Amino acid sequence: IHPHAGGYIEFADEIDKIMEDIPAEVAGLCLDTGHLRYSQMDPVEWLRKYADRLDYIHFKDINEKVYNEVLSEHIRFFEGCGKGSMCPIGTGMLDYPAIYKLLTEEINYNGYITIEQERDPRNVATSLRDVKKSVDYLKSLGFE
């Protein structure tokens, strides 16, 4: 189960309800740091809360200035991505050193993590450049 900003399972109460209703042996959870923060949740708190249900993690970061503009203008999620609400990891508002510490020292997560760069799909060069920046930043924290 992958909660997603702009989707049917997005907010804290919806995530809690579906985790309550669906047994762990039936479905795990793919938490997305960017979608959690976009929907007003602290990724560290939620990764900790559902550590025992984590099957997979998606990493992304949010440009705070663009994010605030998108929210104030009531722009839909994917249109906001096209405007640059998502940015290279390490350049936005998420606390990746805290996420790294949680995953490696506290919950000992050893599963897969996908770096996502949600951008205007017509601008492939920018997306690839941003993914490289994200990889370089995450490696500097200690991610392999």
Segments and roles (model prediction):
Residues I1-A5, T33, Q117:
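Short glycine-centered, acidic/aromatic-flanked micro-motifs in structured strand/loop junctions
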Residues I1-I15:
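Hydrophobic, aromatic-enriched interface-forming segments
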Residues G7, L36-R37:
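Catalytic P-loop NTPase motifs of RecA-like helicase/translocase cores
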Residues A12-A27, L31, R37-E144:
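Histidine-acidic metal/acid-base catalytic patches
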